[in-house]
C-alpha cells in the first residue's frame, strides 16, 4: 500500500497536496481582507449612467463601469464611501471578465456594473471597453491576463488604500510617490481528464494530467515615462497515463517569463509608448492567439512593440520572436530565432449611440499578421510533409453591440508560401478565414442570458495535387484559444466549417455559465482533419462531417484572489472518423487559480 501511494505521488497527484495549504491560506487571507474592505471607501455601485461603459470581450459581452481621465488630470480621486458589504457580497468581487477563459471565448456574459475601485485599467479611454481587451493588453478588470497591464496608481491617494495585501500593489520609493513598485503573484492548478486523448490517437485509455504553475512579477514605475517589468515563472506537470509534456511548455524550471523596459509619453495628441525585451503579446483576435491557455508556460515573445492611442483610434506595431523554452535547466530560456511574429493592429471606435434603449458601441479593427516558421508541416496523401513556411495575413474584425444585439464578425486572407524540407519544392499559399458570432441579450431575464449562434469557415488545402500546386490551408500557429471552438483541443482551426448555438449567462454576480454545441465539418474532403492549426492527424477519413462537440464551462470567483472553474465536453466523432481510427470520448478540466 505504501508503494502504491508513493507511485501516485510520483505520477503527479502528490503535487496537488502542496498547493492545498497555499490555497487555504490565501482564502483565509482574502477573507480577512474582504472583512476589512467591507468599510473601505468605494465608489457607489449605483454611479450615474455617464460613468458606465458597455464592455465586450473580443466581440463578447460585459457591462462594467470604467472611469478614465485625460492624461493631465489625476486618475486617483478620493472615492465616495459605499454601503458596508460582507465578505460574500458579490459587489466586493472583481468581475469575471479578467479570466483567461473569458478572454478566449467568442462571447462573454454581461456583468452588472461594478465600482471603478474594482477595475485597474490604464488611461485608454474608450478602449477600456471590453474589460480593456479592446486596448490590446488582454482583459483588464481587477486583475489582468497580463499583470503589467494593471494600473494600481489610484493607491497613491491614501483614501483608496486599505490594510490588506493590496499594500504591496503600491510601494513608493520617493516622497512624491512618482517612483513605485507593484508586486504580483499567481498560482494555478489544472486537472485534465481525457477519455480518448487526441480522438484516441494519443491514448486509447483514460489519461489524467495535473499541472502546476507559479509566477511572481515586479512592476517598477520610474516617473511618468519609464517602467521596468520582470516576471519569474515555473511549471510542473504529472499525472497517470499522461502525455504531451515534451518541449518545455509544460515542465519548466524557474526562468524569466517576461523582462522588458517601456518608455511612454504624449505626442501628436496621443498616448504613445515603446517596449523592448521579453513580453506576453495578446493584441490579436482569440482565434489567432490567446497566449496558450492550457500549458503551464504561456507564450512569451522577444523583440519590439510600439503603440499609440488617440481618442477613437489606436495602432500597435510589433516584431517579435518566440521564447525557446526547450532547455530544462533553470534560467536557460532564450530567443527562438526560428519563430517570428510581426505586423500591426489598428482599431477605430465608432461614436457611441443609443438603440432600443441600450448604450451601443462598435469597433472596426484592421490588422496584418506575418509569420515565419522554420518548422511547419502540411498533410500529404498518406502522411504529413515537414518544411518551413512564411505567411502574410491581413484581416478585419467588426464587433460590438447595437442595442440588444451583440456581435463579432471577421475575415482574413492568407498568402505566403510553404517549402518542403531538404530544399524540397515550394508552394504558394492562398487561404481564408471567415467567422461570425451574433447573440441577443435578454437583459431583463434572470441571469441576463445571451443566446446566439457562432459560425466559422476556415479553408483547407488539397493534399492530392502536385507538390508545387497552390496550398489553400489556413494556418493559425500560435494556439488560438481553446475556448473558441473546442475545449478538448481535439480539433484545430484549419479546414473547418462549424456552426452551433452559444448561450452565456450569469446565475449570480460572481458566477458564469457558458454553453455551446458546435457541429464540425471539414471545409474540403481533399484535406485532413487537424488536431491543431498546424498539425494534421494521420488518418484520412471519407465524408465531410467530423463531429458534434457539446460543452460547458462554469466559473466561480469565490474571493478577490481565488477562482474555481470546471469545463466539460463530449466529442461525438462521426462514423467516418471512427472507421478511419478515431474515437469518441469525454474531456473534463478543473482549475483552481489564486491570484494576487
Predicted regions and their residues:
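Signature for the C-terminal beta-barrel architecture of outer-membrane proteins
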Residues: 267-274, 287-288, 292-465, 506, ...
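Extracellular/periplasmic loop regions
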Residues: 131-162, 384, 416-506, 510-539
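N-terminal periplasmic/intermembrane-space "pro-region" immediately following the signal or transit peptide
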Residues: 2, 31-204, 217, 451
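Residues on the lipid-exposed face of transmembrane beta-strands in outer-membrane beta-barrel proteins
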Residues: 169, 185, 214-220, 258-263, ...
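Transmembrane beta-strands of outer-membrane beta-barrel pores
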Residues: 187-195, 232-238, 278-282, 310-312, ...
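Bacterial N-terminal signal peptides
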Residues: 15-28
Amino acid at each position: 500500500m505504501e508503494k502504491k501511494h508513493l507511485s501516485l505521488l510520483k505520477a503527479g497527484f502528490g503535487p496537488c497536496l502542496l498547493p492545498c495549504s497555499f490555497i487555504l491560506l490565501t482564502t483565509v487571507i482574502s477573507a480577512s481582507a474582504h472583512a476589512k474592505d467591507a468599510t473601505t471607501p468605494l465608489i457607489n455601485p449605483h454611479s450615474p449612467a455617464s460613468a458606465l461603459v458597455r464592455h465586450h470581450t473580443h466581440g463578447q459581452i460585459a457591462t462594467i463601469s470604467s472611469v478614465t481621465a485625460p492624461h493631465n488630470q489625476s486618475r486617483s480621486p478620493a472615492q465616495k464611501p459605499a454601503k458596508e458589504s460582507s465578505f460574500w457580497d458579490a459587489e466586493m468581487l472583481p468581475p469575471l471578465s479578467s479570466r483567461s477563459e473569458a478572454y478566449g471565448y467568442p462571447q462573454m456574459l454581461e456583468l452588472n456594473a461594478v465600482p471603478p475601485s474594482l477595475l485597474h485599467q490604464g488611461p485608454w479611454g474608450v478602449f477600456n471597453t471590453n474589460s480593456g481587451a479592446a486596448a490590446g493588453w488582454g482583459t483588464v478588470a481587477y486583475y489582468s491576463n497580463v499583470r503589467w497591464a494593471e494600473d494600481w496608481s489610484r493607491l497613491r491617494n491614501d483614501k483608496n488604500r486599505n490594510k490588506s495585501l493590496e499594500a504591496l500593489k503600491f510601494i513608493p520609493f520617493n516622497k512624491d510617490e512618482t517612483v513605485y513598485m507593484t508586486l504580483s503573484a499567481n498560482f494555478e492548478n489544472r486537472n485534465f481528464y481525457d477519455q480518448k486523448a487526441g480522438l484516441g490517437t494519443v491514448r486509447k485509455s483514460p489519461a489524467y494530467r495535473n499541472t502546476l504553475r507559479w509566477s511572481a512579477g515586479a512592476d517598477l514605475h520610474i516617473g511618468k515615462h519609464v517602467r521596468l517589468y520582470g516576471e519569474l515563472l515555473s511549471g510542473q506537470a504529472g499525472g497517470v497515463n499522461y502525455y504531451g509534456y515534451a518541449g518545455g511548455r509544460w515542465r519548466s524550471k524557474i526562468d524569466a517569463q517576461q523582462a522588458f523596459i517601456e518608455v511612454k509619453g504624449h505626442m501628436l495628441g496621443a498616448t504613445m509608448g515603446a517596449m523592448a525585451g521579453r513580453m506576453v503579446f495578446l493584441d490579436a483576435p482569440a482565434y489567432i492567439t490567446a497566449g496558450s491557455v492550457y500549458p503551464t508556460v504561456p507564450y512569451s515573445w522577444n523583440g519590439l512593440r510600439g503603440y499609440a492611442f488617440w481618442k477613437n483610434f489606436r495602432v500597435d506595431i510589433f516584431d517579435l520572436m518566440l521564447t525557446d523554452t526547450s532547455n530544462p535547466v533553470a534560467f536557460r530560456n532564450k530567443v527562438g530565432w526560428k519563430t517570428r511574429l510581426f505586423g500591426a493592429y489598428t482599431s477605430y471606435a465608432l461614436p457611441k449611440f443609443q438603440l432600443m434603449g441600450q448604450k451601443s458601441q462598435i469597433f472596426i479593427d484592421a490588422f496584418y499578421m506575418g509569420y515565419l516558421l522554420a518548422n511547419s508541416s502540411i498533410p500529404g496523401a498518406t502522411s504529413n510533409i515537414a518544411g518551413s513556411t512564411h505567411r502574410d495575413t491581413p484581416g478585419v474584425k467588426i464587433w460590438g453591440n447595437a442595442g440588444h444585439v451583440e456581435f463579432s464578425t471577421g475575415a482574413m486572407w492568407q498568402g505566403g508560401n510553404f517549402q518542403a524540407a531538404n530544399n524540397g519544392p515550394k508552394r504558394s499559399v492562398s487561404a481564408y478565414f471567415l467567422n461570425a458570432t451574433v447573440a441577443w441579450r435578454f437583459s431583463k431575464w434572470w441571469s441576463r442570458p445571451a443566446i446566439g449562434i457562432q459560425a466559422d469557415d476556415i479553408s483547407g488545402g488539397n493534399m492530392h495535387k502536385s507538390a508545387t500546386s497552390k496550398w489553400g490551408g489556413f494556418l493559425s500557429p500560435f494556439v488560438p484559444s481553446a475556448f473558441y471552438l473546442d475545449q478538448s483541443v481535439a480539433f484545430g482551426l484549419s479546414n473547418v466549417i462549424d456552426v452551433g448555438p452559444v448561450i452565456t449567462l450569469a446565475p449570480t454576480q460572481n458566477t458564469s455559465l457558458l454553453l455551446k454545441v458546435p457541429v464540425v465539418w471539414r471545409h474540403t474532403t481533399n484535406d485532413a482533419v487537424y488536431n491543431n492549426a498546424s498539425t494534421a492527424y494521420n488518418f484520412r477519413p471519407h465524408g465531410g462531417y467530423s463531429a458534434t462537440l457539446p460543452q460547458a464551462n462554469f466559473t466561480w470567483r469565490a474571493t478577490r484572489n481565488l477562482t474555481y472553474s470546471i469545463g466539460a465536453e463530449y466529442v461525438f466523432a462521426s462514423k467516418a472518423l471512427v472507421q478511419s481510427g478515431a474515437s469518441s470520448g469525454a474531456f473534463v478540466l478543473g482549475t483552481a487559480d489564486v491570484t494576487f
